[in-house]
Design a protein with these regions (language model features):
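Short, small-residue-biased leader/transition segments that mark boundaries at the very start
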Residues: 1-5
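Short alpha-helical donor nucleotide-sugar binding micro-motif in glycosyltransferases
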Residues: 176-177, 184-189
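Carbohydrate-associated surface elements
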Residues: 71, 93
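Short hydrophobic beta-strand element within catalytic cores of glycosyltransferases
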Residues: 214-217
Length: 291
């Protein structure tokens, strides 16, 4: 980036906005803020007034607002009353997998298919829709196991829901996964599902696709703006989600298409390309600052 980054301030998400605003006032340098999520995403619309005020103040002072998706950009414009001309969609990307992760084997000749949810088990992520879709799938076949990996304030409720639906024997809750465990989970899966209610971006499907695992994502996910080789359903449409899961698990041709083409697609989504776009935006901010 040369010295471009030295001539402006870049603050990431609401906890850093007050420091960014203060640095701008003291230094006179332009402020770029990066919105990875808003409180509308985290709370399903039940916004904390203090958090909202901090977010909006940072946006009001910002000379440039980078959002991780067009979905988030529209939230910033609509809910925080920001000028569209200073708001930009800046999608996330993935780094190439290390050789160590590439060498993790995919199990062959499994007797049962594995469908995985991996992430925070909170209301933003829509875990209950995954459980309900699983219950529908298991009415059609018992040859599939479902995994909900992660932790969060809805974990106990999801364990109880699986029991209420009579699918506890087909459902597993291995807890929080870290590092290599995450990629082992992806590679052990036949389908990855991200049923988020409001997902500013969502990096997990890209990681799963890197591992050759077909993905199903909600239409309310920002990553869907740059992914085509996935199946997209509304988060609340458990019937469409169940159909997609069942189809991938029972149709080898569909599985292979999403596996091969999905990996090709995600391999072209790199941080180097994103970095060039950010640099160009930095330069544009500097050129126009103070005009």
């Amino acid at each position: 980036l040369g010295d471009v980054y030295k001539r402006q301030i870049h603050a990431h998400d609401w906890l850093t906005y007050p420091a960014g605003v203060h640095a701008k006032m003291v230094s006179g340098k332009p402020l770029c803020i990066h919105v990875h999520a808003t409180d509308f995403d985290r709370s399903r619309g039940k916004v904390n007034p203090t958090v909202y005020a901090t977010e909006k103040n940072g946006m009001d002072y910002a000379d440039c607002i980078m959002c991780v998706s067009e979905l988030t950009r529209q939230t910033v414009i609509r809910e925080y009353h920001q000028d569209p001309r200073k708001c930009f969609a800046m999608h996330n990307a993935v780094y190439p997998l290390s050789q160590e992760l590439l060498d993790i084997p995919r199990p062959e000749h499994k007797k049962e298919k594995v469908v995985t949810f991996l992430g925070r088990i909170t209301m933003q992520k829509g875990p209950e829709y995954f459980v309900e879709a699983a219950a529908l799938v298991l009415k059609r076949t018992r040859n599939i196991r479902f995994i909900m990996a992660g932790s969060g304030d809805m974990l106990d409720a999801m364990i109880n829901l699986a029991a209420e639906r009579g699918i506890a024997d087909r459902f597993h809750f291995p807890g929080f996964q870290r590092g290599r465990q995450v990629y082992e989970a992806y590679k052990n899966s036949d389908v990855f599902v991200m049923p988020s209610v409001s997902e500013p971006f969502g990096i997990a499907p890209l990681e799963a696709m890197q591992c050759g695992t077909p993905s199903i994502i909600s239409k309310q996910s920002g990553c869907g703006e740059i992914l085509d080789k996935v199946i997209k359903t509304d988060y609340w449409d458990i019937y469409a989600m169940a159909d997609a899961i069942y189809s991938i698990c029972t149709n080898p041709s569909l599985f292979e298409y999403l596996q091969v083409e999905g990996k090709k697609e995600v391999d072209g989504i790199t941080w180097e390309k994103v970095g060039l776009r950010i640099r160009a935006l930095y330069e544009n901010v500097l050129k126009n600052y103070g005009k």
